[in-house]
Structures are given as structure tokens and as C-alpha cells.
């Protein structure tokens, strides 16, 4: 069997930054460092940070007063920020700057009293944090996941409306939903550029090319990773078998029935180290050659917070 690697794949700038923030906080301040929610959605990464002294919690009530806490790359609501401030917690914010950009759009709509529609997945921490930027009772923010949800929206055609999206959605599904929104609400406003981030876009486009050449696409990523799930779904939509995995032990022999070419990609929160471990495991199942596709070069970089950056330089 032949392995073809998608390019780009794996870590994005926001994930790199978030992991660096936890690592530097541990190095400078020592354990324990509390992290609200998994800093990124990858079991391999989270377990590694936990072994170094990071304590992952779902609510700030689990964090002692005055302790150091890191907000995950997915972002948090204004209520969570206020709670941290009220409890005198030392906060390092690992929210991806591209998520923060969407937060600013929602906050602007809230200040103006413009009703906002967020396209995203219910229950995802990014969605919860984004919706939590809206506080104006005279307006409101409403979540939709798909075209069918639009019919249940309470707004009128002539209402002052704006929309935003989660950063890790399917490009195709989101384009369809936005088109349907604009059809029902012709005057609706939206971002000048799609809120779906560069890494999500690039990895989905790379999977389109990968799927054309593969009998099976393996997506390295955890089950709670939105962008990783979208990659597996996209390959399946293109008529190619796909599997999502985040451990070499997940691999099953029957995946390779009638498979000559295995395509491999990785979600934005999956490390290259894990990809290479999976490749090593695949060699035991008969994979004997590796090819890497040409792809877009990503040079995006996000700085860590100033307090950590100064220590890093010194």
C-alpha cells in the first residue's frame, strides 16, 4: 500500500500559540497551572500537558482563588472573564486571535442592538464563548446549525440583522447556509471575509485533492475536534472511505480491504508527532511507500501574551 500525505495538515498558528502558552506558564510559574476546558481538542496533546502539571477543568469553580488559569483556544464568554476577575484569578488568554475577531463582531452587534445570527455547532465551546459576547437585551443572538434552522428564526425580513460563523465549519455547508440566510433576509449584513479560519479552509481544500487520489482517507484528530470531523466528513462526501483516529492503536486491519492508497491528513489540533506514529503503525499493515502532496505554505504566527513573551526571550 501507498501512503499520500496531505499538505498542509496538523497544527495551525492558533493551536501552536495555545500550547506554547500552557508550556511557558508551567515553565515560568510551575505546576499546577489550571486550564479551563481542553486547551485544544486533542487527547494526545492534553495528556502530554497534564503529565507536565496542567490541570484541566470545565468550570472556574474548580480553580482555587488567586490561582493561574488559562482560557482555551476556543475562547470564553464575557461572564467567564468577569468571574475570573471577581475571584482574582491570574489569567493567560489562549483564545485564538481569529476567534477573538468573531467575538469583536458579536460585541459590536450587541452594542448597536443589532440582532445577530451565529452559524455553528450547539454545545461547542467556541460557540458558547462567542454567543457569550452578546449582552444587549434589546437585540439578541440566535444559533443555527443548518439551512433547516432558518425557518425557526423569529426575526422579520426588515429587521436589522448580522451573521457570523464558527471558525471551524464545513466550507460547503456554511456557504449553503449563508446563501439561504441572504435569500430570506436580503438586507442581512455579514463579515467582509468569511469567519472560517485559514487553517480550516486550507485543510479542507487539501483533503479535496487527497481524496481524489486515495481509496481510504485517515484523519488524525480527536472525536471532539470540530475541524477534524469536518475533514473526515468531506472525504466521505467525495465517495472515499474515511476514518478519524487519534491513536495508532485505533487502526483496524479491515480498514484496508481493497485499499491500495491511503491518504493521511491531520486536524489543526493534531501534532505531526502523532501523524508519524500512525505512519509507523501503518507500515506493519503493509504500507511501503510515502508521498507528500504539494500544498499551500502557511506562515501565520501569533504571539503569546507579553508576560510570557518577555520571559521566553530572556
Curated annotation (Swiss-Prot):
Record's signal peptide: none
Binding positions for isopentenyl diphosphate per the UniProt entry: 41, 74, 124, 225-227, 269
Stretches that traverse the bilayer: none
Organism: Haemophilus influenzae (strain PittEE)
Binding residues for [4Fe-4S] cluster: 12, 96, 197
Xref: InterPro entries: LytB/IspH
Gene (name only): ispH
Keywords annotated in UniProt: 4Fe-4S, Iron, Iron-sulfur, Isoprene biosynthesis, Metal-binding, Oxidoreductase
Protein name: 4-hydroxy-3-methylbut-2-enyl diphosphate reductase
CDD domains assigned: lytB_ispH
Binding sites annotated in the UniProt record for (2E)-4-hydroxy-3-methylbut-2-enyl diphosphate: 41, 74, 124, 167, 225-227, 269
Amino acid at each position: 500500500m501507498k501512503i499520500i500525505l496531505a499538505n498542509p495538515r496538523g497544527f495551525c498558528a492558533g493551536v501552536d500559540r495555545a500550547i506554547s502558552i500552557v508550556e511557558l506558564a508551567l515553565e515560568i510559574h510551575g505546576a499546577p497551572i489550571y486550564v479551563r476546558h481542553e486547551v485544544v481538542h486533542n487527547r494526545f496533546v492534553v495528556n502530554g500537558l497534564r503529565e507536565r502539571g496542567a490541570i484541566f477543568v470545565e468550570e472556574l469553580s474548580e480553580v482555587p482563588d488567586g490561582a493561574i488559569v488559562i482560557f482555551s483556544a476556543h475562547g470564553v464568554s464575557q461572564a467567564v472573564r468577569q468571574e475570573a476577575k471577581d475571584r482574582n484569578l491570574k489569567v493567560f488568554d489562549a483564545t485564538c486571535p481569529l476567534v477573538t475577531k468573531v467575538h469583536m463582531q458579536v460585541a459590536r452587534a450587541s452594542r448597536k442592538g443589532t440582532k445577530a445570527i451565529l452559524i455553528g455547532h450547539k454545545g461547542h465551546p467556541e460557540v458558547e464563548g462567542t454567543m457569550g459576547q452578546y449582552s444587549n437585551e434589546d437585540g439578541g443572538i440566535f444559533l443555527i446549525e443548518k439551512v433547516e434552522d432558518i425557518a425557526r428564526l423569529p426575526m422579520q425580513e426588515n429587521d436589522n440583522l448580522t451573521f457570523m460563523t464558527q471558525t471551524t465549519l464545513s466550507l460547503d455547508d456554511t456557504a449553503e447556509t449563508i446563501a439561504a440566510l441572504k435569500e430570506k433576509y436580503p438586507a442581512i449584513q455579514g463579515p467582509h471575509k468569511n469567519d472560517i479560519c485559514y487553517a480550516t479552509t486550507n485543510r479542507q481544500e487539501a483533503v479535496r485533492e487527497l481524496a481524489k487520489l486515495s481509496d481510504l482517507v485517515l484523519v488524525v484528530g480527536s472525536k471532539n475536534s470540530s475541524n477534524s470531523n469536518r475533514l473526515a466528513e468531506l472525504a466521505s462526501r467525495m465517495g472515499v472511505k474515511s476514518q478519524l483516529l487519534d491513536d495508532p492503536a485505533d487502526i483496524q486491519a479491515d480498514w484496508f480491504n481493497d485499499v491500495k492508497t491511503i491518504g493521511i491528513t491531520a486536524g489543526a489540533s493534531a501534532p505531526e508527532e502523532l501523524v508519524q506514529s500512525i505512519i509507523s503503525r501503518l507500515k506493519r499493515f503493509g504500507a511501503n511507500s510515502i508521498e507528500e502532496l504539494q500544498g499551500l505554505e502557511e506562515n501565520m504566527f501569533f504571539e503569546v501574551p507579553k508576560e510570557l513573551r518577555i520571559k521566553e526571550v530572556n
